[in-house]
Amino acid sequence: IEMITVVFQPYAVKALFHIPSHLFHGQNVDTDAMEDVELSDLVKQVTDTSDNAVSIRLIEQFFLRRLYTLPEYNLKRMFHEINLQPQINIAHLSETACLSSKQFGRIFADYVGTTPKEFIRIVRMQRALSMLQQDATIPFVQVAYECGFSDQSHMIKEFKLFSGYTPAEYLSVCAP
C-alpha cells in the first residue's frame, strides 16, 4: 500500500487527537505533523507489514482504543438531532447539552471545525441535494420544507451560495 486515507466524522479529530478540527478543515494532514507518539508507532507498524488486512486491523484497533477512553461530550447525540431535525436551533442544542449557547458553540467548533449554525446549513444543503438527486421532479417548496429551510427562496439562496447553482440550474447540469 502506498497510502492509507482515514476519513473522520466531524467530531472525531478533536476527540481522538485533542487538536481543534478547524486546523484540519480542507487539509490533507501528514501524520508526522501531528506530533503524536502513539500515532507514529501505528504508522511504523502499518509500514512494516505487507498484509493489507493486518494494516487495516491495526488502524481499527488503534482508533477503538482511543474511542474507549474519550470523555463524554455527547456530540454524537447532537449530530443525530441535527440530522433528524434540520430546522433545529442552536438554543435547543445547547440546552440539550446542558451548556450555554456560547460554550456549546465553542466546544462544537473545537470538535467539528465549524460553528453549529454553519454545520446545520451544510446538513440542510446535503439533504436538499440528496432529495433532488433521488427525485428531480420533487417540488422545490417541498424540498425546502422537508430540509428545514424557512421558505423556498431561502433554500434557493443557500443552494446557490453552496453550489454556485440554483436548484433548477443544478438539475439541468447534474441530472440524476
Question: Model-derived features: where do they sit?
Answer:
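Alpha-helical bundle regulatory/interaction domains
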Residues: I1-A91, E95-S101, T115, S130-Q133, ...
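A secondary-structure capping/hinge motif
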Residues: D110-T114, E158-A168
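Short conserved catalytic/interaction loops centered on acidic-Pro-aromatic/His motifs
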Residues: F104, T114-I120
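Conserved structured core elements
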Residues: C98, F119-I122, S153
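Basic, nucleic-acid-binding surfaces and adjacent catalytic neighborhoods in DNA/RNA-processing proteins
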Residues: I107-Y111, S130
